[in-house]
Amino acid sequence: ASPQIDPFLLERVEVLKGPTSVLYGQSPAGGLLNQVGKRPTATPRNEVGVEFGTNDHVRGTADFSGPIDAEGKFLYRFSAVGLSEDGQFRTTENERVALAPSFTWRPDADTSLTLFGFYQRDPRSNSYGGVPPEGTVLPNPFGRIPVDFYDGEPGFEQFDRTQKSVAYDFDKRFDDTWSVRLNGRWLRTEADYDSVYANGLAPDFRTLFRGVATSREAMDSYTLDNQVEGRLTTGPVNHT
């Protein structure tokens, strides 16, 4: 049930190198990737896109943002993605629907509250199978195996993942010295997964061993990040 956010819903991806556990909790020592979602903008922007490709690939995107009122105290943003395509292997498909609305309230120049919503459904996903080396990169007396060879079981395999999230971001500057930042997020991921996959060829080079994997998962994540910032000066030294 690992979360996976469609890249179109992201503003940017930051690479944080080295240990970051002091700031962000348990994480690999080599660093981590910070995915930053799209936020409402004070400048109006409207984008609609459609793309077509091989394997009956069709993907539609939409991104709308701007102020709601004339004073710019209320801002909004709405991003959406829809995807349908055939997978690399025969009988497999990919499908996705994702929505990301957000709303910002700025009552004054020193206060800002942003609310985020996120929903993504992947009712189908490409097979995680593969092809054996004999017949692809190594010789096989029975010939080559097609690159779209499907090693699964159509009546059994399935993948269905749903993700939803609600988050907030509050900033308040009291004066030139003190400010606070309050952030919180709830994320739920549900995934149902059944798979049959290749597990090597028998010595006769024509019988395929297969394995089975099945999973029913649900995960809830709660994250809080509260910060107080003060800027002080002691003689020639500035402190934050």
Where is each model-derived feature located?
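Periplasmic plug
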Residues: A1-P19
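Membrane-spanning beta-strand positions in outer-membrane beta-barrel proteins
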Residues: R45-E47, K73-L75, D110-F116, D171-R173, ...
